[in-house]
Every structure is written in C-alpha cells, then in structure tokens.
Amino acid sequence: MKPFPRAEISAQALKNNLSRLRQIAPNSSVMAVVKANGYGHGLLNVASCLTEADGFGLARLEEALALRAGGVKAKLVLLEGFFRQVDLTTLVEHGIDTVIHNEVQLDMLENASLSKPVTVWLKLDSGMHRLGFTPEQFAQVYARLEACPQVAKPINIMSHFACADEPDNPMTQEQLQVFEALTKNSKGYRTLANSAGTLYWPDSQADWIRPGIALYGVSPVIGDLGRNHGLEPAMKLVSQLIAVREHKAGQPVGYGCFWHAKADTRLGVVAIGYGDGYPRNAPEGTPVWVNGRRVPVVGRVSMDMLTVDLGIDAKDSIGDDVVLWGKELPVEEVAEHIGTIAYELVTKLTPRVAVCLD
C-alpha cells in the first residue's frame, strides 16, 4: 500500500529535463543545483538521477558531504562558501569547491594551512547586492587569490542574476555587461546563468549554467510553465480522500466557519494540511485534481486536512487519489493561486510527506 500524502518523484522527468537544458545551452557544462534537499525532491534521489550532470551546486557543507557519502564523485560547489576556517580542511579532504564572496573568507583562506590547494569560485556582485565583491573590489581580490598558495589555479568566477525571471527587466542586461567587462579575459571557468538566465538569456550561459528549479520541470518566471520550454514536472504531490460528505446549502465547513455552501453539494476531505507543508493561506478556489478534473479548495486548510467541493453530482469515493500538484495540475498554477512561488511549495514539504522515487 502506498503511503499518503506522498511526493512521487519521476526519475525520467529529471533525466529528460537535464537533457533538455543541455539542448538549450549546448556549449555549457551543467552545475545542477540540488540545495534545499534537492528542492524538496530528495537530495540523493536527484543526484542518483542526474549522474550525467557535470557537477552539483549546494548551499551547505552538510549537503555536499551527504553527496560524497552517497558515492557522488562529480564536482561539488558550495554556493555560499565556507563559514569556518576548519571547514577548509574538510573541503580539501573531500574535493569540494568553494565560493569566496567576502573579506572574512578571503582572510581565512590566506591564513589556512592546507595539504593541497582548494578550488575557488570568486563571487562578483554584478548588481544583486546580496553576496560578492563589488566591481571596484574585484581586481584586487582576484590578485590576492592569484597570489594565495592555498588556491588552485586558475580561479573561477561566478555571479548571480537579480531579475532574470522578469524577461523584460533591463537589470539583467546591465548585470551581463558588468560580468563580461570584468571577466572576459579570465582563464578559469565562468558561470552566471541560473534557470531563468539559461532559458531567457542565452548570452549569459558562459562555461557553466546553474539550473535549479528548471531541472525539476518548473518555470522560474511567474505566469509561465515549465512545459512551455520542453520541461516535465518531476514531482507529483498526492494524497487521498478520507471522507465524502453530503453538504447542505448555507452550511459552513472548517475552522472559523467562514465558507458557506451556496447550494447543496458534496465535500471531500483530503488527508493533507499545513503540517505536511501545504500552505494554510491557500484561498478558496485553489485547485486540486480529483478523478480527471479540477475541484476547488473550500474552507480553511487545517494541520492535517483540507476540504474540497466535489460538486453535487460527484461520484468520488473514500480512498480516491487527490493530486495537489503534478503533471495534471502544474505547481506554477497552484503557487499563483496561493500568492507564492513554486520554489516555496516544493521545498516546504515536511517529513510527514513520503518522498518516493519513481
């Protein structure tokens, strides 16, 4: 018997999405971003499906070590870098690359005693103003890294887009110009394109692309769908009906009793709630998929359950599957109804949701 709720992860979709991104950026290596537990799809699940990726991008050292322990031998890059000097020894021991984005990291690196040099990616702040060295600092920091015996040569360079998911925003072109001007003569690898850069800004693809959400079949752009780019949803979030109830016109349902039926209907109670990561703020009308059709959420989402209006003529039964998002119902659309982004939905599932590789 399959558990519920569960997130069914399609290995074939992950592989197909990687292949599709290679078609879109044929001259670039692929750094598959698998931070946040593989965007909620399971870190080792995703890595086991993306063995053809050239490397993996992660946010935490613990994530990188989990991949090494799981037998992953590909290039691993810590996108936020290291936080303690002692971590440098671990990076060298396990062959993990690190981003350098601030003066403290640079000082720790220069004062470290390492058995061999560590591979670094110098982070340029090309306009996002979150991490990285400014264009004015860039040449001096680059020279310090060149002179540092603890740093493997050549030095790689990275930056990150602020607005690439807004295709008409001129900021992306400005960042691209800054990046090109400062890095065009560099000897190491260069990487700038995230998912949105890869899909919408081909001039940004450089030596490496860093797709995250696109690998999972989701578009990074509000109002767009991954399938418009030949991508397939990798996650299907499924639960079941645990009750089907006759409901009279005027009767409320759920905490607060703020929703009342306008006519006689049948309500279905679904075994999923905010305790599983489904948003409590999902408004009336948020769609779910039951037996080949969309039906709306009604009433307030509770910790373990939500309620849907199946309609007066519904033939649905207890035990029937309910798809919260997946191929039938794109997560991008669900996110738009709720007023959030698909990234948040897929990464906020709690451990109560069984993640099953298909």
Swiss-Prot record:
Write down the EC number: 5.1.1.1
Q: Which reaction does it catalyse?
A: L-alanine = D-alanine
Q: Which residues form the active site?
A: 35 (proton acceptor), 255 (proton acceptor)
Q: In which pathway does it act?
A: Amino-acid biosynthesis; D-alanine biosynthesis; D-alanine from L-alanine: step 1/1
Cofactor names from the entry are: pyridoxal 5'-phosphate
The UniProt keywords, alphabetically, are: Isomerase, Pyridoxal phosphate
User: Where does the chain bind substrate?
Assistant: 130, 303
GO-annotated molecular function: alanine racemase activity; pyridoxal phosphate binding
- N6-(pyridoxal phosphate)lysine occurs at which residues? 35
Any single GO CC term annotated in Swiss-Prot or TrEMBL for this entry: cytosol
Q: Which Cys residues form disulphide pairs? A: none
Q: Report any one BP term from Gene Ontology.
A: D-alanine biosynthetic process
The record lists the membrane-crossing segments as none
Instruction: State the superkingdom.
Output: Bacteria
Q: Name one Pfam family in it.
A: Ala_racemase_C
HAMAP family on file: Ala_racemase
What job does this protein perform?
Answer: Catalyzes the interconversion of L-alanine and D-alanine. May also act on other amino acids.
Q: Which family does it belong to?
A: Belongs to the alanine racemase family.
Q: What is this protein called?
A: Alanine racemase
The scientific name of the source species is: Shewanella woodyi (strain ATCC 51908 / MS32)
